[in-house]
Every structure is written in C-alpha cells, then in structure tokens.
C-alpha cells in the first residue's frame, strides 16, 4: 500500500492503517513549504508523522512525479486523503484495487478543496465522509461507502475537521478489509444531480459585511475558523471575530451600528444582530469581547466596519 496525504486531516487514517497492520510501503505528501513569520521551510503534518512511524516519505512536486514513485512500488492499493495533487489517469490504473479516497463531504455535494467550510457556510444540517475510487475527474469517482453526521450549531471548521478525520478513517477500514479478502464491493456512481463545488478558501472572503443577515455572518465566523478568519474593525482596531451568536433586533438601526456593549457587544446586521463573544486583535490572543472593550471602549450608537 501507498498512502498519499498532507494535512492534519489525513493523520487519523494513516495511524489507523498502521495500527491495523497494513504494509505501507511509502507515504506521498506535499513538499516542505515556507510557513510562519520566518517563512521557514516546514514539512507537512503527514510527513512529520510518517517519519516518526518509520515510513519512507516521498515529496514529488507534481502528479507525474507521484506516478514515478507509485509505478516503482507497484502497490495493491493507494489510499489518498487530502493529498493536494491531482493524480494522472496513468497512475490511477497502476494499483490492482485502484486509488481510494476519503473525501470530507457526502458526495456529490461539495466536491473540491474546501468541503467542510462550505458546508458550514451554507448552513447544511449534515455532512459526512465518502470513500470513493478516484477517476480522472475532480471528486467524481464511484462511491464505495458513506457516513453522515449532523453539524453542531456551534461547530467550527476546525472542530468538524477533526471529527470527520476520525470518521473517515473508521469508514475506510471495512472497505479495505473487503478488498483484501477478495469480497466484492458495490461501487455506486455519483448522482447526476446535487453536485456542488467547494471552491478553495480565499483570504479576502474573511472580511465581514454587516449588511448581510446575522445568521449568515455567524456561519461565516464558524466556517472560516481557523482560516482565513472573519475580520472587522471595532473601536478602530482591526480584529478577528472568534465567536458570535445571533440575537433578535426588531428595531435595529443601520447595519454595523453598536446596539449594546453590556452585557454583550451586540452589533446590528442586515437582518437581526450579532452578539460578538470572542475577539482577537493583531499580535494578541483571542479574548472575551468584554475584556477587549475594557481596553478599547465603545458606546451604543457607534459604528463598526
């Protein structure tokens, strides 16, 4: 077996495979990238974990490089979890059991790079994981298993990602066990309707627009935690909003107007209002809104951006 993955989301699957005794010949992951304020070359989370587990690691720059590695190893199966590279059809044809992928949505909804954040942003009641066999398309391959979970009312992308990472590992195992035992697995083609694309998150999406409904803003905050964050200017200070809840505001003034500062910082939105509970200024830790307001006083009737 060859394992291909890059972020933290892929680690539970890798660890589960190791614990189950599968022979992982090698791990493919993205090359080291500059990270942090010093822009120091940093290995991916999967690379760090694989090396700690004693598994050989390869970091090809593209799909062609990945194919060279897989062709040399000729594995029975390749398990792909948030690898970050499109694999060419010639690579997909090498393993006898194909290339199996853990995708963090209930396909065909939310194909693409950011399925977890987009599900929260859209207000989906549930999401889940799909085990599919990769084909030449983008998350279009036949489905071998699915598992659904409800999205919690206060759940962020960070928290839901951790939950789905473990669910994906659990859902993968029966599929692999059946393949290794020679049992047939029904591969179900994805429906032709209901497909949606989860485009990659962009930093500029984090800017808050107080003219939107408060419910949409609350989902934006949860969807964009931890990245890119939801940004605003409050009391003249650029901040990242860490948490908020929707509150009624039957006679609210213009969007962006501060309604109250005690007991909560409540700001009018296009419909209803947002009670901001956690804030983070630049070079500071996330803190309760009350603590922020002690250092940066604000009055009802003032405007924020």
What are these regions, as identified by a protein language model?
Residues 1-226, 281-283, 302-305:
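One-carbon transfer enzymes
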Residues 211-305:
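An anion-binding loop in the catalytic cleft
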């Amino acid at each position: 077996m060859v394992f291909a993955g890059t972020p933290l989301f892929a680690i539970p699957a890798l660890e589960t495979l190791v614990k189950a005794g599968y022979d992982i010949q090698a791990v493919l992951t993205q090359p080291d990238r500059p990270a942090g304020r010093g822009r120091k070359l940093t290995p991916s989370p999967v690379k760090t974990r694989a090396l700690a587990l004693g598994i050989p690691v390869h970091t090809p720059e593209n799909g062609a490089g990945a194919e060279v590695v897989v062709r040399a190893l000729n594995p029975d199966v390749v398990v792909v979890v948030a690898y970050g590279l499109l694999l060419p059809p010639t690579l997909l044809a090498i393993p006898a059991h194909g290339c199996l992928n853990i995708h963090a949505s209930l396909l065909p909804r939310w194909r693409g790079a950011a399925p977890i954040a987009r599900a929260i942003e859209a207000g989906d009641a549930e999401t889940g994981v799909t085990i599919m066999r990769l084909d030449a398309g983008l998350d279009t391959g036949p489905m071998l298993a699915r598992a659904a979970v409800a999205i919690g009312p206060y759940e962020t992308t960070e928290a839901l990602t951790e939950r789905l990472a473990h669910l994906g590992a659990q859902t993968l195992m029966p599929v692999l066990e059946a393949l290794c035992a020679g049992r047939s697995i029904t591969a179900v083609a994805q429906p032709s309707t209901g497909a949606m694309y989860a485009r990659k998150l962009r930093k500029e999406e984090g800017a808050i627009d107080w003219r939107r409904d408060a419910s949409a803003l609350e989902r934006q905050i949860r969807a964009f935690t931890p990245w890119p964050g939801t940004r605003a200017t409050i009391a003249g200070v650029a901040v990242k909003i860490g948490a908020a809840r929707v509150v009624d505001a039957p006679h609210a003034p213009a969007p962006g107007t501060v309604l109250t500062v005690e007991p909560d910082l409540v700001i009018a939105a296009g419909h209803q209002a947002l009670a901001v509970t956690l804030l983070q200024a630049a070079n500071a830790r996330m803190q309760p809104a009350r603590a922020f307001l002690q250092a940066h006083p604000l009055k009802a009737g003032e405007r924020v951006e």
